[in-house]
Amino acid sequence: MSTPAESSDSKSKKDFSTAILERKKSPNRLVVDEAINDDNSVVSLHPATMEKLQLFRGDTILIKGKKRKDTVCIALADETCEEPKIRMNKVVRSNLRVRLGDVISVHQCPDVKYGKRVHILPVDDTVEGVTGNLFDAYLKPYFLEAYRPVRKGDLFLVRGGMRSVEFKVIETDPAEYCVVAPDTEIFCEGEPVKREDEERLDDVGYDDVGGVRKQMAQIRELVELPLRHPQLFKSIGVKPPKGILLYGPPGSGKTLIARAVANETGAFFFCINGPEIMSKLAGESESNLRKAFEEAEKNAPSIIFIDEIDSIAPKREKTNGEVERRIVSQLLTLMDGLKSRAHVIVMGATNRPNSIDPALRRFGRFDREIDIGVPDEIGRLEVLRIHTKNMKLAEDVDLERISKDTHGYVGADLAALCTEAALQCIREKMDVIDLEDDSIDAEILNSMAVTNEHFHTALGNSNPSALRETVVEVPNVSWNDIGGLENVKRELQETVQYPVEHPEKFEKFGMSPSKGVLFYGPPGCGKTLLAKAIANECQANFISVKGPELLTMWFGESEANVREIFDKARQSAPCVLFFDELDSIATQRGGGSGGDGGGAADRVLNQLLTEMDGMNAKKTVFIIGATNRPDIIDSALLRPGRLDQLIYIPLPDEDSRLNIFKAALRKSPIAKDVDIGALAKYTQGFSGADITEICQRACKYAIRENIEKDIEKEKRRSENPEAMEEDGVDEVSEIKAAHFEESMKYARRSVSDADIRKYQAFAQTLQQSRGFGSEFRFENSAGSGATTGVADPFATSAAAAGDDDDLYN
């Protein structure tokens, strides 16, 4: 026996927040296994297990499954059954709502009576076309001399003659469970049971909610404990909590959780949809609320679930209508002024917790507010497994990979993704499916399975719902599309890809990754292109913010826009926020140019600064700014911690120009005699955009020539129909040197020398302001000076650009 101090010490190390979710070990909890003999009323256990539970062969036992379902069976011993397992067939499993591998509990059931009367009806889709008397053909042989136990509400399958028929136990007398003895009367008159009524899909249990393990534990503590064991709270002497407010983005499963809790606790579930309460008559709306609470009290223990609670309980000072205020007051008195409402728990759900009246958000009304957020990778995997458990998946589907690729998706988005993948699978089979036919070939149905390819296509077509407004195309630009700029690419990968792909390394070195990058340089050098490539390469979500869009004419609206964008980015983290033309919103403050709409630009900048620095380190949100006027950007933005890495993107040198030509002409057919190297040599001082322009113009000339040739050919053909075979040769099938020569006549440089001098001067002043420490050495590190002496990698690129033979000879 350990000393109390020790045991309490070991306890304190354990995390108790999810203790309620852990399975309790006890001998009567058994794991479900597949049955060998297929009998609906028999389960088999290992003799040792039966001995532990004090059962004898042939005893009737009560088995409890999920979602408050239970049934009665006969226990048999089976040596081959492993120790903590219980073998049951499919019918029993579906009555208990369990699958193979789930845990059920077994209880003795000594007081089962012989039934006087049972009422049994068939299920409609299994008796179509069955002729003759069902009782004689199916039920009589099934129950004859078998002494089968039945439970009211169970379904069972009877095999007979040609086919099997499913029956449902509608009513049993004298109790819910009884044994059908030879003298029991069996009624089977009545309409067959409809299958739709049976398979209620809204029977969700805890197994159908994924990705919210911690929140689920809190909710079960607050709901199940008071409803099932109220004496726990009594013995300690506290009042059990009364209300829970679930909040989070739409689609994260708030209503689903409430429904699962209601099904699993077996409590009476009363759902109030916010707007339904409202009525045009005075006093009517409040009485509707009162009725709902009264109804719930009558059927205690019960759960009242108010969906979209922000619609009926908005802040009283902000609402104009008298009715809304009265409803809020009524809700407050019902929730707190109640003669301590016994066993009634109120759950509310909303995605705008801050628009609810603050009086509701205190202890005693909504005690606990639980954030049902966007699930992480493990959570997404859980959700995907839940949604695909009934899907027919091919072998190659890699759910873990999919969960890695779906950053920022909530449960609803993942469900949509699975549906989209299934639709994709159906589309492929569309050529063999005829819509007019009444039925589809069984072969086709069996051959359908959702493959990894389908999921990939679906991933391309869907994006997280948090980003629906700022529709984000992850652009199709890869590193190969960008010529040159090797240094910049490496730096970018380190800034953005490492924190997303290797977060554990940053933890190991105890550092939070840098969050911001500013590209500056002459127009047309690929700043925007780089941002697109990084968004594509590192699988993060990508929001592009155009600077001027943020400014609006309304006071305070512009700052709200900035706030909203950052909120969205955090919700769908990891996310790259790309501010193009940053200088339009981040000009130096106090410029007082008079025409900036009452200082709107200054306020936007202040909002930006607070958002960037007040950003939670937990979320991976990167900011990339691009500008070609770095000199007018406010210096507060350029400090480390906001946009810490200032990357100068110079005009391309010869190698880079060659790469840009290659990247631009990657998909075009080019004649053998075109020397791209010569073009690259000749285009000294051209920006990337200028070079692309040259290529486009050359293509245009080739196309023009091609079309002219076609017209000429048509003409010749119409004049001389016989001679058309010979001259199919002189097609213009590629871009020739002549086209490039023609195009070079119109080529122009978009960046003047004066501009370049400006950029380089700026880059060098930055370099000087940064280069203070380049001579620094630790005292005893004479030998390792080589490693520490390397300055910022961009010193080289900026200097190289500067030394480029004084601009260019």
UniProtKB/Swiss-Prot annotation:
Binding site for ADP: G210, G248, P249, P250, G251, S252, G253, K254, T255, L256, H387
InterPro entries, per database record: AAA+_ATPase, AAA_ATPase_CDC48, AAA_ATPase_domain, AAA_lid_3, Asp_de-COase-like_dom_sf, ATPase_AAA_core, ATPase_AAA_CS, Cdc48_dom2
Region (Disordered): 782-809
Localization annotation: Nucleus; Cytoplasm, Cytoskeleton, Phragmoplast; Cell membrane
An annotated GO BP: pollen germination
Protein's membrane topology: Peripheral membrane protein
Recorded GO CC terms: cytoplasm; cytosol; cytosolic ribosome; Golgi apparatus; lipid droplet; nuclear envelope; nucleolus; nucleus
Biased composition (Low complexity): 791-801
Modified residues (Phosphoserine): S41
Entry's Gene Ontology molecular function annotations: ATP binding; ATP hydrolysis activity; identical protein binding
Binding site for ATP: G521, P522, P523, G524, C525, G526, K527, T528, L529
Entry comment on modification after translation: Phosphorylated on at least one threonine residue and on Ser-41 by SERK1.
UniProt cross-references to Gene3D superfamilies, sorted A to Z: 1.10.8.60, 2.40.40.20, 3.10.330.10, 6.10.20.150, P-loop containing nucleotide triphosphate hydrolases
Source domain of life: Eukaryota
Keyword Mitochondrion (UniProt): no
Oligomeric form and interacting partners: Homohexamer. Interacts with SERK1, GRF6, KAPP and SYP31, but not with KNOLLE. Component of the SERK1 signaling complex, composed of KAPP, CDC48A, GRF6 or GRF7, SERK1, SERK2, SERK3/BAK1 and BRI1. Interacts with PUX1, PUX2, PUX3, PUX4, PUX5, PUX7 and PUX11 via its N-terminus.
Protein family per UniProt: Belongs to the AAA ATPase family.
NCBIfam families for the chain: CDC48
Summary of the function given for this chain in its UniProt record: Probably functions in cell division and growth processes. Interacts with certain SNAREs as part of specialized membrane fusion events where vesicles from the same organelle fuse (homotypic fusion).
The name this protein goes by in its record: Cell division control protein 48 homolog A
